[in-house]
Amino acid sequence: MFEIGPGHGTLGELAVRAGWQYTAVETSPLLIDVLRKKGLTVIESWTPPFPMADAAADVIYADQILEHMRGIDDARQFTAEALRSLKPGGHFFVVVPNYLEERGFFWDVDYTHNFVTTPRRMMQLLYDGGFEVLHMERAIGVSTGLARDILSAAKLFVNLPGVDTLSRYTGTEELIFKIRKNLFETLTFVARKPGEAPRS
Protein backbone atom coordinates (compact mmCIF):
# COMPACT_ATOMS: atom_id res chain seq x y z
CA MET A 1 0.00 0.00 0.00
CA PHE A 2 1.26 3.45 -0.96
CA GLU A 3 -0.15 6.65 0.52
CA ILE A 4 0.46 9.92 -1.31
CA GLY A 5 0.54 12.81 1.17
CA PRO A 6 0.22 10.84 4.44
CA GLY A 7 0.03 13.77 6.86
CA HIS A 8 1.06 12.59 10.32
CA GLY A 9 0.74 8.91 9.42
CA THR A 10 -2.58 7.99 11.05
CA LEU A 11 -3.60 5.70 8.19
CA GLY A 12 -0.05 4.34 7.95
CA GLU A 13 -0.03 3.23 11.58
CA LEU A 14 -3.41 1.53 11.16
CA ALA A 15 -2.29 -0.16 7.94
CA VAL A 16 0.90 -1.54 9.52
CA ARG A 17 -1.06 -2.82 12.54
CA ALA A 18 -3.44 -4.57 10.14
CA GLY A 19 -0.51 -6.32 8.44
CA TRP A 20 -0.18 -4.21 5.29
CA GLN A 21 3.18 -3.44 3.73
CA TYR A 22 2.92 0.36 3.82
CA THR A 23 4.97 3.12 2.17
CA ALA A 24 4.33 6.86 2.48
CA VAL A 25 5.22 9.33 -0.28
CA GLU A 26 5.89 12.79 1.19
CA THR A 27 7.79 15.99 0.36
CA SER A 28 7.85 17.85 3.69
CA PRO A 29 11.07 17.25 5.69
CA LEU A 30 9.13 17.93 8.92
CA LEU A 31 6.47 15.33 8.15
CA ILE A 32 9.06 12.84 6.88
CA ASP A 33 10.79 13.10 10.27
CA VAL A 34 7.47 12.56 12.11
CA LEU A 35 6.63 9.53 9.94
CA ARG A 36 10.06 7.92 10.31
CA LYS A 37 9.96 8.39 14.09
CA LYS A 38 6.74 6.36 13.99
CA GLY A 39 8.63 3.59 12.18
CA LEU A 40 6.92 4.11 8.83
CA THR A 41 8.67 3.64 5.48
CA VAL A 42 8.84 6.94 3.59
CA ILE A 43 9.90 7.92 0.07
CA GLU A 44 10.74 11.62 -0.30
CA SER A 45 9.24 12.68 -3.61
CA TRP A 46 6.97 15.20 -5.33
CA THR A 47 4.06 13.72 -7.29
CA PRO A 48 3.43 13.35 -10.12
CA PRO A 49 5.36 11.35 -11.22
CA PHE A 50 5.02 8.55 -8.67
CA PRO A 51 8.27 7.03 -7.34
CA MET A 52 7.05 3.44 -7.84
CA ALA A 53 7.78 0.80 -10.44
CA ASP A 54 5.08 -0.30 -12.87
CA ALA A 55 2.42 -2.52 -11.25
CA ALA A 56 4.06 -2.24 -7.81
CA ALA A 57 1.02 -1.46 -5.65
CA ASP A 58 -2.16 -3.24 -4.60
CA VAL A 59 -3.57 -0.01 -3.15
CA ILE A 60 -2.82 3.69 -3.62
CA TYR A 61 -4.48 6.17 -1.27
CA ALA A 62 -4.49 9.94 -1.84
CA ASP A 63 -6.42 12.10 0.64
CA GLN A 64 -6.94 15.73 -0.44
CA ILE A 65 -4.04 15.85 -2.89
CA LEU A 66 -5.64 16.17 -6.33
CA GLU A 67 -7.15 19.60 -5.68
CA HIS A 68 -3.59 20.92 -5.24
CA MET A 69 -2.60 20.00 -8.81
CA ARG A 70 -1.70 23.02 -10.96
CA GLY A 71 -4.44 22.17 -13.45
CA ILE A 72 -6.02 19.48 -15.61
CA ASP A 73 -2.73 18.33 -17.14
CA ASP A 74 -1.20 17.60 -13.73
CA ALA A 75 -4.44 15.95 -12.55
CA ARG A 76 -4.39 13.70 -15.63
CA GLN A 77 -0.73 12.84 -15.03
CA PHE A 78 -1.46 12.06 -11.36
CA THR A 79 -4.24 9.67 -12.42
CA ALA A 80 -2.09 8.11 -15.16
CA GLU A 81 0.71 7.53 -12.65
CA ALA A 82 -1.69 5.83 -10.26
CA LEU A 83 -2.87 3.52 -13.06
CA ARG A 84 0.71 2.72 -14.08
CA SER A 85 1.80 2.01 -10.50
CA LEU A 86 -1.11 -0.28 -9.61
CA LYS A 87 -1.21 -4.01 -10.23
CA PRO A 88 -4.12 -5.23 -12.39
CA GLY A 89 -7.14 -5.32 -10.10
CA GLY A 90 -5.49 -2.82 -7.73
CA HIS A 91 -7.50 -0.08 -6.03
CA PHE A 92 -7.09 3.70 -6.06
CA PHE A 93 -8.75 5.56 -3.18
CA VAL A 94 -9.05 9.31 -3.77
CA VAL A 95 -10.49 11.87 -1.34
CA VAL A 96 -11.18 15.41 -2.61
CA PRO A 97 -13.26 18.44 -1.57
CA ASN A 98 -16.70 18.82 -3.12
CA TYR A 99 -16.47 22.21 -4.82
CA LEU A 100 -20.21 22.25 -5.57
CA GLU A 101 -20.92 22.30 -1.82
CA GLU A 102 -18.05 24.57 -0.79
CA ARG A 103 -17.90 27.16 -3.62
CA GLY A 104 -15.95 30.19 -2.35
CA PHE A 105 -14.75 28.38 0.77
CA PHE A 106 -12.90 25.91 -1.50
CA TRP A 107 -10.59 28.81 -2.40
CA ASP A 108 -10.55 30.49 1.01
CA VAL A 109 -9.71 27.44 3.15
CA ASP A 110 -6.36 26.79 1.42
CA TYR A 111 -4.48 29.09 -0.95
CA THR A 112 -2.86 26.08 -2.67
CA HIS A 113 -6.18 24.77 -4.03
CA ASN A 114 -6.01 24.93 -7.84
CA PHE A 115 -7.86 22.04 -9.48
CA VAL A 116 -11.65 22.17 -9.01
CA THR A 117 -13.03 18.80 -7.87
CA THR A 118 -16.71 17.91 -8.28
CA PRO A 119 -18.45 14.51 -8.46
CA ARG A 120 -18.81 14.59 -12.25
CA ARG A 121 -15.34 16.02 -12.97
CA MET A 122 -13.72 13.35 -10.80
CA MET A 123 -15.76 10.54 -12.39
CA GLN A 124 -14.70 11.76 -15.84
CA LEU A 125 -11.05 12.11 -14.78
CA LEU A 126 -10.95 8.56 -13.40
CA TYR A 127 -12.83 7.00 -16.33
CA ASP A 128 -10.69 8.84 -18.88
CA GLY A 129 -7.64 7.74 -16.90
CA GLY A 130 -8.53 4.08 -17.45
CA PHE A 131 -10.16 3.27 -14.10
CA GLU A 132 -13.41 1.54 -13.23
CA VAL A 133 -15.15 3.70 -10.61
CA LEU A 134 -16.68 1.34 -8.05
CA HIS A 135 -18.07 3.80 -5.52
CA MET A 136 -18.32 7.44 -4.49
CA GLU A 137 -19.09 8.49 -0.91
CA ARG A 138 -19.95 12.01 0.31
CA ALA A 139 -18.77 12.81 3.83
CA ILE A 140 -18.41 15.61 6.34
CA GLY A 141 -15.61 14.51 8.63
CA VAL A 142 -16.34 10.83 9.24
CA SER A 143 -20.11 11.31 8.85
CA THR A 144 -21.85 9.81 5.80
CA GLY A 145 -25.45 9.14 4.79
CA LEU A 146 -28.15 10.73 6.96
CA ALA A 147 -25.63 12.12 9.48
CA ARG A 148 -23.82 13.91 6.64
CA ASP A 149 -27.12 15.28 5.34
CA ILE A 150 -28.00 16.68 8.78
CA LEU A 151 -24.59 18.35 9.09
CA SER A 152 -24.95 19.70 5.56
CA ALA A 153 -28.28 21.28 6.52
CA ALA A 154 -26.69 22.79 9.65
CA LYS A 155 -23.98 24.29 7.44
CA LEU A 156 -26.64 26.50 5.82
CA PHE A 157 -26.75 28.64 8.97
CA VAL A 158 -23.07 29.67 8.77
CA ASN A 159 -23.49 30.48 5.08
CA LEU A 160 -26.53 32.74 5.37
CA PRO A 161 -26.18 36.18 3.75
CA GLY A 162 -24.79 38.65 6.27
CA VAL A 163 -23.01 36.10 8.49
CA ASP A 164 -19.55 37.26 7.36
CA THR A 165 -20.41 40.93 7.90
CA LEU A 166 -21.88 40.20 11.33
CA SER A 167 -18.83 38.11 12.29
CA ARG A 168 -16.53 41.06 11.55
CA TYR A 169 -18.52 43.27 13.94
CA THR A 170 -18.76 40.62 16.65
CA GLY A 171 -15.16 39.40 16.41
CA THR A 172 -16.26 35.86 15.51
CA GLU A 173 -14.60 35.58 12.06
CA GLU A 174 -12.18 32.88 13.23
CA LEU A 175 -15.00 30.91 14.87
CA ILE A 176 -17.09 31.02 11.67
CA PHE A 177 -14.04 29.90 9.66
CA LYS A 178 -13.45 26.94 12.02
CA ILE A 179 -17.11 25.89 11.88
CA ARG A 180 -17.06 26.00 8.07
CA LYS A 181 -13.80 24.04 8.01
CA ASN A 182 -15.25 21.34 10.28
CA LEU A 183 -18.33 21.11 8.03
CA PHE A 184 -16.23 20.83 4.85
CA GLU A 185 -17.66 18.19 2.51
CA THR A 186 -15.40 15.65 0.84
CA LEU A 187 -15.90 13.01 -1.84
CA THR A 188 -14.21 9.62 -1.58
CA PHE A 189 -13.81 7.61 -4.78
CA VAL A 190 -12.95 3.93 -4.92
CA ALA A 191 -11.55 3.12 -8.35
CA ARG A 192 -10.10 -0.10 -9.73
CA LYS A 193 -7.46 -0.78 -12.36
CA PRO A 194 -8.99 -3.23 -14.87
CA GLY A 195 -7.60 -6.74 -15.02
CA GLU A 196 -7.31 -9.73 -12.77
CA ALA A 197 -5.43 -9.38 -9.51
CA PRO A 198 -2.51 -11.83 -9.41
CA ARG A 199 -3.10 -14.83 -7.16
CA SER A 200 -0.69 -15.24 -4.26
Language model region names:
Residues 72, 115-116, 181-182:
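Short, solvent-exposed loop/helix junctions and linker helices
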Residues 42, 133-136:
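Generic structural signal for residues in well-ordered beta-strands
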